[in-house]
């Protein structure tokens, strides 16, 4: 008999295997290891979910099902379906199984007869098939061709095409095939196949048909599974397709829509699986993706709360079985629900024992914490141990016949592994527990223990300022909401061809060709691929090829009749449609590293791309390691004075400063608040005797004492010897701050300090009076290179120069634009490091990608070569606090600092003289009662005097003696750096090279990399004194304080700080010479003298901590060519820099050393001189090529033409007189110079060559009147010519004759300040000026260029634990990492133990005179006498003994600071004090470090238009603009000064005869005129806009006037033509200005593709441009034209809207209105213009942001519906929302969850441009107390 026991899910901690019997059972039941029987879902593989052509969704086997809201899902297949796939996809890693099951739930069309599924081999032979219809056929043919077609198993008497649902299971086991129909009928047939049959998996699987078959399956199908286990067919109705009335059991089935419902006991152990054909009722639209692992399935498809999720590896238990299991009225066995697909069978082999699945897989360890109940049997019966009969035993029974029986009469021996008819039918499902399918291998894992309690709050961290303790990286945050899509970037370059995709599905079979006459054999060009190796990826043959092969083979099989004549070639059928993409193959193994490619030639220079929009700032990276200290850079520009910083921590004590003069006594401060009572102080010294007090009341009469003898007053005793040194007392509390001690004696004059750094340059002072001209100075050293000037006028194209010598390798280019950011990929295996590839071209800037996780920090790179000294950088951001620097030289004594905090108690100073009596302090707290002291001597009774008035305070005591010299203070802070060193000695003279032609100034080179640490330079000479600074502004007047009590006059204070300089006074009269003064005290240290000779090298100091990188210096001198270094790794592509302005030409450089000989160039024939070319666009720098090998010196080449002007060289020694350089651009106007001395008269020059005709001369003196000419016609008014290009300056003329002095002109008005002239050559050194005052802090320099890319950022926070990955192969051991950077100092450690007592101190000084000794023994008390009369006051008695400590007095004056005491041990932290009053507002602190970038804030309202900004500084000279239209003729100018006489003209030919004029009055005969020049009368040259015709040269014999008129007329015509040409050009290519608007932004982009995004003027309706309006052009998005909502339409702040009704339009709100739109200047856009803009646009786009608090904007995630979605009213009065407009989508839908503050961003991107912009919005989800919303309306953008 079976004894059933069960495993109960143990409580945590309960032992699971408590009996040895269970262990024995586990050992007996251990199954043999077997491969997992993983069902393969053919419908999933054929992509039924995406409904391919001919497939639709329909209701499945069950219209309703218990515990499920939705019906089963099935697929209706029509004749149009063409579905096939390579068999390899079904079994990618293995062969087709010998024994298997085919399971399907199907409803075939009534009366049909077609194959449901067919499997073909590589040659196109059908190997497997299932035909549905009357008498179904199971077709099977193995690799040996067995069984033949006549032996295929046939199942007569069964009709599967009756139009009803059937559950069909076919089990193929050895040489039997069993059909189980509808869980009732079982028919077994003999299958005469070979002993080891093979089904080829290199062919294809067709669904619903056979190749060349006319019959195609039509009907509905819900499931079609292949299982690699023949026993799965017997479980079909329990595990895969249960009955409709079967409730969803406790089994962890994949269909469970709500896993919580099946655990009434609340254990919360849930499994999550997917089932592909039953829709999740909570999300009907979801199509779950298959997954290979149950754990991953749960993670990928559903979010399950943490407490409920459990990995599905715990063993579920067995279903309930009973005797009724096989009855026809209850075909479902047990309470099984829908069967899972891949997920469920991932690790589950079938066992060869009964339903008790309680034994682990031998590979798995046992986990005693399993939470499942497993029924076990204590008896090992034949039911659970006998294997199925072998085929030999069953052969005679089965034979060729088949047995037909119902399931209840199953052969027990055959079926008993699955069915136990003797099982206890009384076992209830609750006892058995959650069911476990028979095919689930059990893996026991622990149930999680109960959640621990929250731990106690940790101690607060001790983090000091500037200390950064890096925590462990946090868990990865949840994925952020997807950002709104960026604007469309420019089209990228064509990518590399992708890998070949998987083969598509086979196409439709072609139509039959017409039968042709006999002909040649057709050879189809198929590539028959041989079988790949095991593990090769994907099928070797495409699906189309397999299908064609199958067609051929099928045709061959069909032609089994007598051979007919050979047919002609038939027409090929049409190509079927491409199949859908197959599943992507697994990633291939990494191939071996390929050989390094040859360096490609540099590509052609691309056109410069448009400048991308600036990306948003990245997160701030961690500061990199401090680089080595660089060379001292040139002084940068002075920064603006920063805001006042926080008060720094008190620095270490500086050396004692020079004693200052006594300051004046300050006003008395206000009385401070009363302090807390202090602890009782130590016993004070005996105070001076106070004034006699008032008489007290008579005391109580005491007891009479025994009369004692009255002793005489003894003489005062001598002071005793000094006592021994006592032990040091306990450390006292810190005393109060002592008073400032008297100034010490003046110390000896210290050594002059090191010269300080030159101060920041002050602003230029006012110009001084002009001094007398100095004597001519000697040739000064060449000055520093001046700033790069504005570009001069474009020069004439120079002739080609000599070919230059080969240059050294260029510096690294700047980074390119960042590319598109990709999604974060899966972390791949660590590959081998490949060789660096060649640098690619710069890609266009992509839109900003989603922020990826921070990468791991990279390894430190090797130190680069020392770079050249760069240009001075601009001030960078403040760095993080660096490590403590090394101790610098002692600085100068600083100014008196503010009062420091209380110091540690000093050692006691020498005793000062007694000060005056202080006023009586307030009463202190009661002290501790002291021990009774010894009795003092009785004093004489003094009479009580009347209380005297309080006397005045005594005078201040004399100043104490100066104290001893204090110990040396700690070293001061680092001094300022020294002045720049002198120029080094001149290097060795190089070989004199041939003089190179002067070159053109090149653009500024890229910034060099940080060089290694240079040697410290020598200190430079002191700079010139700065000019007088401007006076500062006066401070605000403070509030008047309360008058304090009158103080005593103090000693003179130290001199105050130097005041600001006053306004410059008028010059006073010259005073008389004074008397010689006496010798003054030694002055302050003078300016540093010139450096002495270099001393011997000192010992090498320790390597200092690396300093912060200094500012970028200017370019240093070019170093000699270095040895080629090892090739570094490929750097990142640099960004194209903006072209800098062309600098002014520098002076001619020194003769350079001869370069290396270059290759010989071939001698070309000289070309003709070309005309001047247009200015080309600046191309981006090409990639730097590799350094070539040094060539052999070639033969000397022929002299080439002079090259272009070279770059400005460094200043060398003065060379010989160079050849004349190019004329420089005109400099700014200089100051008026003094008149020069008259020059000597020069010699008469030679007669020059004939020059070109000069400009018209001035009007000459009147000649003798000529004969009257004829009357000419009146001339027309000509247009002025266009402005000519500026000619090059002529050679200097000879000095003119000195003119007579003119009269003194009137005083001119004060002129505006002229522009700064260029730097003059360095003058001779002037006399040493007085040291100037420190100027105010300079203005801040301009913002610096972006720095080099920072080091990699700190590792980002760790992400959430991802799904466990597969274990990777062991990696190769990594290289030894470079040592990490030095860690920052940790927090202060705990106080150390108290040290041993120190050595005995030095012997003390001799003590002062001791107090009076103690009295003698006490005598007996005498009786109290009567009170006598008040006597006269007696003499003051001797000092009594020290009394009891008196009350605490007021705080005395601060004592002088003692020397530093040793630091005491660290005390325990005190209790927190009471909260103090809030202090005054502190000064503004230093700007903090730049924080991490916060999340983007909500869009703010558009601000009001700001006030006009201050006048900006004049910008650089712009590029030459388009020539403007001719202006109107100006008024005639005044006659010019007479010019010099021109050269004699050449003889001209006689002009044409003019018309005869009227006879004039006869005049005097004049002298004959000079012959004139012939000038072309018609300057018809369309390209010239400047006329070289001089009207004075046209006058010849009075007949030239007609020519003048004619020429002037032509000039007017040409001016008009030029204007027309400009206007036509602007019409063709509008500029987007108000006078020349474009039609749309798209038009503007087409004409000017290089324009940046911004505001431009458009005029969509064209015509007059006065109605144009200004829009925002988004060229990055392809040329969108954007208009904005007006200020009141931009949106509304988030609020609860209590008075508004949900479902009403915003325009009906009290604060609402219809939305209206304006242009970029705030003017409304006209309706007509908007209409034309829409006509010119193909699509329109607008974003709306809904800011919510627990309010839905679009989808309601709780219900999955869009009932509460916002509705919009378009410009065409059309309502738009989710239900009627597919062009609205949610870019971000944070409001769907109704959790806290969120936002939803909706985008309308519609081709119906008349809908945009929206004019009204309807909101529906608000009104409850906890709901709020606001919204923001974005611009409407139209794209043409």
From Swiss-Prot:
Subunit structure: Trimers of two alpha 1(V) and one alpha 2(V) chains in most tissues and trimers of one alpha 1(V), one alpha 2(V), and one alpha 3(V) chains in placenta. Interacts with CSPG4.
Chain positions covered by the region annotation Nonhelical region: 231-445, 1573-1607
Biased composition (Pro residues): 472-487, 689-698, 1108-1117, 1382-1400, 1456-1471, 1528-1543
Modified positions (5-hydroxylysine) in chain numbering: 629, 644, 710, 746, 776, 797, 806, 809, 812, 821, 848, 866, 884, 899
CDD domains: LamG (cd00110)
PROSITE patterns noted in UniProt: NC1_FIB
Biased composition, class Gly residues, residue ranges: 1296-1305
Residues the record lists as 3-hydroxyproline modifications: 682, 688
Localization terms from the record: Secreted, Extracellular space, Extracellular matrix
Region (Interrupted collagenous region) location: 446-560
Biological process annotations from GO: blood vessel development; cell adhesion; cell migration; collagen biosynthetic process; collagen fibril organization; eye morphogenesis; heart morphogenesis; integrin biosynthetic process
Signal peptide region: 1-30
Biased composition (Low complexity): 335-352, 375-387, 462-471, 508-525, 561-572, 673-688, 724-743, 749-758, 910-919, 973-992, 1001-1013, 1090-1106, 1261-1270, 1487-1496, 1544-1556
Identification of the protein by name: Collagen alpha-1(V) chain
């Amino acid at each position: 008999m079976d004894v059933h026991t069960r495993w109960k899910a143990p409580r945590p901690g309960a032992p699971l295997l408590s009996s040895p019997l269970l262990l024995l059972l586990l050992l007996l039941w251990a199954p043999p290891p077997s491969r997992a029987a993983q069902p393969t879902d053919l419908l999933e593989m054929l992509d039924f979910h995406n409904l391919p052509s001919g497939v639709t969704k329909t209701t499945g086997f069950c219209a309703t099902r218990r515990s499920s809201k939705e019906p089963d899902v099935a697929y209706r297949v029509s004749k149009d379906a063409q579905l096939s796939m390579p068999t390899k996809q079904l079994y990618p890693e293995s062969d087709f199984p010998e024994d298997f099951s085919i399971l399907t739930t199907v409803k075939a069309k009534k009366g049909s007869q077609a194959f449901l599924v067919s499997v073909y081999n590589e040659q196109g032979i059908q190997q497997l098939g299932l035909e549905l219809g009357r008498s179904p056929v199971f077709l099977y043919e193995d690799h040996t061709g067995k069984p033949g077609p006549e032996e295929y198993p046939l199942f007569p008497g069964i009709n599967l095409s009756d139009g009803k649902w059937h559950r069909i299971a076919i089990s193929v086991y050895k040489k039997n095939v069993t059909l189980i129909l509808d869980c009732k009928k079982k028919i077994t047939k003999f299958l005469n196949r070979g002993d080891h049959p093979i089904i080829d998996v290199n062919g294809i699987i067709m669904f619903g048909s056979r190749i060349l078959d006319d019959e195609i399956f039509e009907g509905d199908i819900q499931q079609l599974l292949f299982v690699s286990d023949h026993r799965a067919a017997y479980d079909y109705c329990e595990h895969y397709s249960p009955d409709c009335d079967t409730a969803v059991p406790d089994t962890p089935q994949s269909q469970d829509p709500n896993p919580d419902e099946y655990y009434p006991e609340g254990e919360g152990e849930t499994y999550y699986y997917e089932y592909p054909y039953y829709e999740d009722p909570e999300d009907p639209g979801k199509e779950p993706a298959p997954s290979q692992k149950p754990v991953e399935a749960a993670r990928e498809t559903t979010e399950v709360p943490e407490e409920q999720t459990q990995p599905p590896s715990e063993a579920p238990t067995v279903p309930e079985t009973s005797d009724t299991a096989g009855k026809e009225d209850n075909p479902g066995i047990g309470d099984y629900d829908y069967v899972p697909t891949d997920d469920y069978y991932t690790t589950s082999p079938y066992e060869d024992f009964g339903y008790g699945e309680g034994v682990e897989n031998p590979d798995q360890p046992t986990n005693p914490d399993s939470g499942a109940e497993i029924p076990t049997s204590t008896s090992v019966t034949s039911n659970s141990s006998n294997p199925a009969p072998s085929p030999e035993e069953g052969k005679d029974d089965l034979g060729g016949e088949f047995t037909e029986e119902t399931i209840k009469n199953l052969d027990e021996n055959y079926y008993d592994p699955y069915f136990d008819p003797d099982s206890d039918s009384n076992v209830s499902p609750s006892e058995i527990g959650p069911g476990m399918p028979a095919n689930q291998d059990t893996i026991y894992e622990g149930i999680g223990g109960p959640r621990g309690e929250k731990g106690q709050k940790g101690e607060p961290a001790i983090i000091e300022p500037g200390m950064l303790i890096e925590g462990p990286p946090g868990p990865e945050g949840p994925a952020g909401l997807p950002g709104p899509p960026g604007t469309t970037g420019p089209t990228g370059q064509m990518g590399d061809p992708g890998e070949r995709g998987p083969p598509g599905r086979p196409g439709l079979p072609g139509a039959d060709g017409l039968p042709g006459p006999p002909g040649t054999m057709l050879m189809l060009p198929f590539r028959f691929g041989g079988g790949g190796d095991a593990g090769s990826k994907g099928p070797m043959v495409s699906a189309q090829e397999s299908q064609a092969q199958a067609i051929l083979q099928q045709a061959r099989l069909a032609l089994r009749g007598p051979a007919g004549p050979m047919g002609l070639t038939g027409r090929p059928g049409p190509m079927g449609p491409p199949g859908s993409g197959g599943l992507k193959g697994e990633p291939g193994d990494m191939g071996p590293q390929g050989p390094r490619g040859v360096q490609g030639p540099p590509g052609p220079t691309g056109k410069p791309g448009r400048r991308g929009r600036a990306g948003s700032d990245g997160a701030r990276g961690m500061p990199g390691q401090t680089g080595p200290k660089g060379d001292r850079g040139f002084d940068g520009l002075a920064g603006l004075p920063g805001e006042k910083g926080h008060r720094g921590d008190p620095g270490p004590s500086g050396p004692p400063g020079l004693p200052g003069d006594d300051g004046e006594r300050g006003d008395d401060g206000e009385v401070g608040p009363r302090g807390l009572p202090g602890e009782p102080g130590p016993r004070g010294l005996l105070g001076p005797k106070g004034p006699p007090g008032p008489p007290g009341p008579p005391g109580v009469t005491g007891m009479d004492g025994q009369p004692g003898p009255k002793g005489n007053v003894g003489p005062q005793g001598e002071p005793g010897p000094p006592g021994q040194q006592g032990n040091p007392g306990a450390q006292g509390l810190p005393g109060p701050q002592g008073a400032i001690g008297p100034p010490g004696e003046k110390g000896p004059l210290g050594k002059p300090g090191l010269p300080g750094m030159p101060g920041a340059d002050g602003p230029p002072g006012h110009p001084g009076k002009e001094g007398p001209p100095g004597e001519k100075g000697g040739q000064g050293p060449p000055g520093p290179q001046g700033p790069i000037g504005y570009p001069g006028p474009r020069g004439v194209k120079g002739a080609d120069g000599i070919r230059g010598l080969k240059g050294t390798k260029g510096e690294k280019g700047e980074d390119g634009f960042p590319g598109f950011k990709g999604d974060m990929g899966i972390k791949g295996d660590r590959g081998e490091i490949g060789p660096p590839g060649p640098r690619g071209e710069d890609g266009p800037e992509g839109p900003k990608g989603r922020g990826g996780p921070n990468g791991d920090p990279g390894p430190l790179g090797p130190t680069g070569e020392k770079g050249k000294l760069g240009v001075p950088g601009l001030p960078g951001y403040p760095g993080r606090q660096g490590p403590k620097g090394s101790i610098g030289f002692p600085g100068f004594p600083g100014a008196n600092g503010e009062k420091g905090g209380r110091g540690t108690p000093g050692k006691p100073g020498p005793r000062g003289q007694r000060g005056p009596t202080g006023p009586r302090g307030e009463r202190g707290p009661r002290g501790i009662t002291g021990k009774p002291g010894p009795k003092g001597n009785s004093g004489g009774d003094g009479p009580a005097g009347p209380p005297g008035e309080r006397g005045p305070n005594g005078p201040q005591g004399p100043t104490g003696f100066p104290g001893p010299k204090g110990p040396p203070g700690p070293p001061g802070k680092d001094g300022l750096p020294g002045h720049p060193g002198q120029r080094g000695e001149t290097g060795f003279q190089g070989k004199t090279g041939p003089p190179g032609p002067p070159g053109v100034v090149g653009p500024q080179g890229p910034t060099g990399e940080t060089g290694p640490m240079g040697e410290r330079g020598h200190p430079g000479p002191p700079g010139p004194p700065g000019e007088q600074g401007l006076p500062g502004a006066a401070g605000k007047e403070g509030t008047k304080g309360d008058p304090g009590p009158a103080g005593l006059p103090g000693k003179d204070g130290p001199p105050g700080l130097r005041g600001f300089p006053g306004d410059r006074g008028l010059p006073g009269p010259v005073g008389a010479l004074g008397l010689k003064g006496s010798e003054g005290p030694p002055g302050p240290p003078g300016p540093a003298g010139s450096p002495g000779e270099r001393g011997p090298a000192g010992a090498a100091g320790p390597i200092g901590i690396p300093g912060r990188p200094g500012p970028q210096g200017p370019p240093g001198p070019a170093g000699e060519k270095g040895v080629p270094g090892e090739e570094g790794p490929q750097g990142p592509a640099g960004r194209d820099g903006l072209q800098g302005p062309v600098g002014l030409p520098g002076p001619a450089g020194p003769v350079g050393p001869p370069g290396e000989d270059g290759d010989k160039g071939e001698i070309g024939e000289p070309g003709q001189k070309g005309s001047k070319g247009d200015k080309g666009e600046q191309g981006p720098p090409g990639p730097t090529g590799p350094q070539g090998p040094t060539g052999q010196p070639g033969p000397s080449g022929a002299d080439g033409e002079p090259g272009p002007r070279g770059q400005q060289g460094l200043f060398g020694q003065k060379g010989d007189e160079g050849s004349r350089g190019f004329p420089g651009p005109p400099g700014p106007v200089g100051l008026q110079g003094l008149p020069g001395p008259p020059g000597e008269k020069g010699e008469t020059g030679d007669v020059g060559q004939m020059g070109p005709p000069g400009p018209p001369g001035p009007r000459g003196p009147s000649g003798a009147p000529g004969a009257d000419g004829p009357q000419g016609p009146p001339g027309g008014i000509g247009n002025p010519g266009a402005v000519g290009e500026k000619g090059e300056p002529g050679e200097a003329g000879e000095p003119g004759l000195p003119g007579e002095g003119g009269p003194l002109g009137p005083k001119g008005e004060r002129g505006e300040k002229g522009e700064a002239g260029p730097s003059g050559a360095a003058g001779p050194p002037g006399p040493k000026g007085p040291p100037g005052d420190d100027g105010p802090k300079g203005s801040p320099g301009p913002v610096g260029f972006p720095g080099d890319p920072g080091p990699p950022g700190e590792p980002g926070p760790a992400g959430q634990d991802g799904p466990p990955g597969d274990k990777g192969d062991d990696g190769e051991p990594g290289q030894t990492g470079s040592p990490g950077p030095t860690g920052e100092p940790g927090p202060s450690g705990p106080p150390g133990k108290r040290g041993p007592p120190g050595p005995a101190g030095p012997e003390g000084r001799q003590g002062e005179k001791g107090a009076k000794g103690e009295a003698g023994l006490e005598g007996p008390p005498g009786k109290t006498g009567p009170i006598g009369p008040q006597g006269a006051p007696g003499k003051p008695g001797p000092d009594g003994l020290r009394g009891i400590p008196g009350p605490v007095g007021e705080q005395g004056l601060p004592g002088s600071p003692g020397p530093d005491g040793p630091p005491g041990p660290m005390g325990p932290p005190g209790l927190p004090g009471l909260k103090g009053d809030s202090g005054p507002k502190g000064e503004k602190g230093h700007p903090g470090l730049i924080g991490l970038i916060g999340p983007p804030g909500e869009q703010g309202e558009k601000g009001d238009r700001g006030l006009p900004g201050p006048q900006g500084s004049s910008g650089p000279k712009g590029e030459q603009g388009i020539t403007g239209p001719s202006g109107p003729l100006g008024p005639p100018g005044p006659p010019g000064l007479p010019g010099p006489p021109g050269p004699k003209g050449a003889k001209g030919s006689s002009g044409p005869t003019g018309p005869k004029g009227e006879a004039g009055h006869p005049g005097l005969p004049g002298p004959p005129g000079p012959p004139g020049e012939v000038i072309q009368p018609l300057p018809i040259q369309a390209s010239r806009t400047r006329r070289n015709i001089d009207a004075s040269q046209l006058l010849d014999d009075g007949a030239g006037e007609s020519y003048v008129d004619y020429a002037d007329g032509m000039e007017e015509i040409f001016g008009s033509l030029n204007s027309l040409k400009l206007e036509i050009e602007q019409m063709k290519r509008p500029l987007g200005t108000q006078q020349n608007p474009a039609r749309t932004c798209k038009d503007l982009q087409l004409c000017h593709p290089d324009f940046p995004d911004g505001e431009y003027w458009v005029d969509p309706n064209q015509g007059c441009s006065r109605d144009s309006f200004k829009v925002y052009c988004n060229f990055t998005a392809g040329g969108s034209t954007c208009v904005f909502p007006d200020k009141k339409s931009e949106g509304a702040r988030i609020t609860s809207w209590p008075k508004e009704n949900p479902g009403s339009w915003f325009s009906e709100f009290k604060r609402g209105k219809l939305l209206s739109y304006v242009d970029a200047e705030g003017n409304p856009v006209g309706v007509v213009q908007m209409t034309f803009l829409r006509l010119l646009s193909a699509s329109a786009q607008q974003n709306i942001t809904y800011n919510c608090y627990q309010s839905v904007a679009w989808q309601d995630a709780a219900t999955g519906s869009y009932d509460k979605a916002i509705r919009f009213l378009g410009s065409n009065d059309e309502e738009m929302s989710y239900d009627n407009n597919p062009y609205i989508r949610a870019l971000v839908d944070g409001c769907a969850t109704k959790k806290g503050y969120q936002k939803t961003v909706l985008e309308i991107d519609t081709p119906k441009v008349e809908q945009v912009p929206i004019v009204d919005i309807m909101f529906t989800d608000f009104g409850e107390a906890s709901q709020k919303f606001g919204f923001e309306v974005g611009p409407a953008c139209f794209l043409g």
